[in-house]
């Protein structure tokens, strides 16, 4: 009997299973057989019981033991194949979210095959240098990736005890970031921007120039081959996608970049899986291949709107501005997949880009993102209108991990003090500028005029730099000292006397 069943499996047929015949145990036995169905030996279950289509969702009836998050393959009447995922299960009903959209689905003629597996993505080191669509299929006319592994796109939970606190500063070459909002390797820090601002140019500049300031002993390989970029675009236009692709090609880093592109004309629903595909690939490169991965996700606002669309189709109770109440949790499942893990040399640094609707930082998307991430880089429209690049407003910007990544032995011992003093002087300068608009320049004191001079030179010399100008952190600090010398020593109250006596004199540039 066992031998006959084995031959059946080899020949591609399903082994005959004993059929329950009546009795009180029959129903339980049938359920056990159905739940533990083995897809290697038994054919997959296919249904033509679509009862309705609502937005990106397909509702099926009379499904035998559907499972949450199970992948479903849909075949349309014209032979087109699409993929979906079970979002909700209620008895014999299943709600399936279709990644490629539901246009063209005929309720009577569409067949749905339940695979019995969750959504996995093939991963390989060969994915570097390749371009994929939002569902992970190659769109660069290259061959299908030969997978080294198939990983769950939701990722593996990381034991918090095994996380390493990010302490190595990444030098971006941008003074407003390196000097006052330093980024650590393994940090998640978003760029808060708005429509029409150069956030893509800033992200591309960070990709071009990013590198370690000090190389610690525990990291083995610092070669360029050990650095990788995973770029995920959600709902961006063709111009943005082409900009990043050409920028990576021009600076010779395309071989170390993996791109996932969901464009504005691609299905909205696909945007929900695009960042997860990118992060699963990044986790494989970081923790299996031990690479240092920079993940850029743009535009997270498009992702959140796709989430709202699914929520509305499911007729869930909406939260603020129509976004679902679980959006905070959902965003956390993306942002928290950054960091470093004990025993592995690799790391994942995340820079999500989001465009604030109507430049409103209190909008739910930037508001919830700010709670989860470790700071933000704020791109300001007023600075942009005055032709300042990069238009980073340092006052609302923040890096919560800066304190552990700077200082003696990591950057320079005066770094924290210079940053604090620059912040204080810039904030006072902004207040003086507002007061000048009310009372006029004649009513200002001599100290106020010094702050106004500092304000002008700070924006002109410190914040402003070229898109290909790569400043070291030491050059940034020296520019900071040049600006602080506008004030007499007595006015620099945020800097200790010992640091002032060492760096304030004109020849301190030699340090």
From Swiss-Prot:
Top-level division of the source organism's lineage: Eukaryota
GO biological process, one term: ATP metabolic process
Keywords: ATP-binding, Cell membrane, Cytoplasm, Cytoplasmic vesicle, Hydrogen ion transport, Ion transport, Membrane, Nucleotide-binding, Synapse, Transport
Residues the record lists as binding ATP: 400
Principal subcellular localization: membrane
Function: Non-catalytic subunit of the V1 complex of vacuolar(H+)-ATPase (V-ATPase), a multisubunit enzyme composed of a peripheral complex (V1) that hydrolyzes ATP and a membrane integral complex (V0) that translocates protons. V-ATPase is responsible for acidifying and maintaining the pH of intracellular compartments and in some cell types, is targeted to the plasma membrane, where it is responsible for acidifying the extracellular environment.
Family of the protein in this entry: Belongs to the ATPase alpha/beta chains family.
Quaternary structure note: V-ATPase is a heteromultimeric enzyme made up of two complexes: the ATP-hydrolytic V1 complex and the proton translocation V0 complex. The V1 complex consists of three catalytic AB heterodimers that form a heterohexamer, three peripheral stalks each consisting of EG heterodimers, one central rotor including subunits D and F, and the regulatory subunits C and H. The proton translocation complex V0 consists of the proton transport subunit a, a ring of proteolipid subunits c9c'', rotary subunit d, subunits e and f, and the accessory subunits ATP6AP1/Ac45 and ATP6AP2/PRR.
Protein name per its UniProtKB record: V-type proton ATPase subunit B, brain isoform
Gene: Atp6v1b2
């Amino acid at each position: 009997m066992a031998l006959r069943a084995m031959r059946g499996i080899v020949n591609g047929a399903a082994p005959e299973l004993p059929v329950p015949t009546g009795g009180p145990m029959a129903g339980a036995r049938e359920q056990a057989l159905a739940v533990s169905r083995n897809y290697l030996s038994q054919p997959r279950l296919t249904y033509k019981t679509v009862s309705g289509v609502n937005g990106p969702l397909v509702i099926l009836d009379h499904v035998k033991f559907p499972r949450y998050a199970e992948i479903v393959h849909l075949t349309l009447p014209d032979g087109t194949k699409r993929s979906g995922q079970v979002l909700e299960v209620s008895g014999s009903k299943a709600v399936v979210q279709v990644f490629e959209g539901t246009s063209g689905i005929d309720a009577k003629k569409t067949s749905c095959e339940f695979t019995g597996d969750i959504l996995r993505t093939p991963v390989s080191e060969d994915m570097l240098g390749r371009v994929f669509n939002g569902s992970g299929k190659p769109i660069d006319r290259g061959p299908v990736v030969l997978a080294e592994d198939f990983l769950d796109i939701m990722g593996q939970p990381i034991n918090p005890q095994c996380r390493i606190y990010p302490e190595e500063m990444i030098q971006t070459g941008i003074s407003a970031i390196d000097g006052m909002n330093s980024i650590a390797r393994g940090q998640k820090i978003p760029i808060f921007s708005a429509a029409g601002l150069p956030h893509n140019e800033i992200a591309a500049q960070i990709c071009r120039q990013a590198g370690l300031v000090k190389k610690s002993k525990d990291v083995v390989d610092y070669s360029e081959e050990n650095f990788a970029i995973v770029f995920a675009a959600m709902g961006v236009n063709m111009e943005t996608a082409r900009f990043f692709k050409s920028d990576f090609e021009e600076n010779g880093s395309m071989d170390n970049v993996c791109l996932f592109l969901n464009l504005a004309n691609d299905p909205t629903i696909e945007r929900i899986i695009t960042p997860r595909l990118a992060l699963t690939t990044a986790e494989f490169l970081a923790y299996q291949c031990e690479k240092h991965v920079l993940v850029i996700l743009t535009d997270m606002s498009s992702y959140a709107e796709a989430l709202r669309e699914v929520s509305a189709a499911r007729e869930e109770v909406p939260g603020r501005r129509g976004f679902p109440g679980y959006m905070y949790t959902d965003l956390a499942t993306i942002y928290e997949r950054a960091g470093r893990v004990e025993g592995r040399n690799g790391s994942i640094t995340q820079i999500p880009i989001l465009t604030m609707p109507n430049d409103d930082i209190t909008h739910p998307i930037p508001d919830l993102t700010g709670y989860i991430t470790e700071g933000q880089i704020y791109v300001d429209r007023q600075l942009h209108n005055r032709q300042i690049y990069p238009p980073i407003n340092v006052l609302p910007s923040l890096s919560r991990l800066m304190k552990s990544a700077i200082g003696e032995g990591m950057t320079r011992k005066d770094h924290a003090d210079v940053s604090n003093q620059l912040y204080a002087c810039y904030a006072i300068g902004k207040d003086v500028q507002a007061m000048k608009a009310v009372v006029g320049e004649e009513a200002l004191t001599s100290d106020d005029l010094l702050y106004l001079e500092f304000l002008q030179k700070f924006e002109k010399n410190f914040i402003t730099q070229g898109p290909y100008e790569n400043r070291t952190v030491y050059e940034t600090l020296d520019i900071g000292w040049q600006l602080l010398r506008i004030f007499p020593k007595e006015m620099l109250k945020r800097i200790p006397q010992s640091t002032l006596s060492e760096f304030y004199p004109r020849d301190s540039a030699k340090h």
